[in-house]
Amino acid sequence: MPRLGVAVSLVGSLLLGGCMQATLAPSSNANLTPRDRQLLAHPPYAQATIAEQYQRHVVDYARREQPGTILVDTDARYLYYVLPGGKAIRYGVAVGEEAMAFSGVATVGRMAEWPDWIPTREIQERLGPYPSRVAGGPANPLGARALYLYQGSKDTLFRIHGTNQPEYIGQAISSGCIRMTNNDVIDLFDHVKTGTTVVVLPPGNQSTFAGPFTGRRI
């Protein structure tokens, strides 16, 4: 996917004085649909243990994005959903090459539950062969949900989606966009709507949280 020439206005900063306060967000199955429960009950992949720093947390947030905005920090392998009151939900993500090739501001133009996956010609040549279309389900690389990012009416080809390889959360990988665990992408999906603003920081940005990781489980 070509790099889009869209500059990100890095207003504010993620630098905080002192420690970053983080609270481990409770995991709940209350937002799962009957189909989610059925498809996630026996996934065709090994259950992964996600390192605590990449588990879902509510954190302090010092930038100036408005509540309801998504911010993606590809370097740190985090995605933030901005809440009111200087807080955000922080999710750990896996970052593919396609994600590293995009930075800028976009909006969520389409949302899908258990989306089908249509491998591109480049993916077929590099990693295939795959079927021309892979039906939605736990074996599908797009996972339980997908957010399709647009700039105006143009599809950027950048996606935020679930995964059938949760063991890679917190890592850079060879292909794909922004991958989240299926439970996390379902949680994010339930917060956002079509038109939600998404800010993707460029690789090498210096806007990262400072200070030791602190928090408590709830």
Describe each region flagged by the PLM.
Residues 2-218:
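N-terminal pre-domains immediately preceding structured catalytic cores
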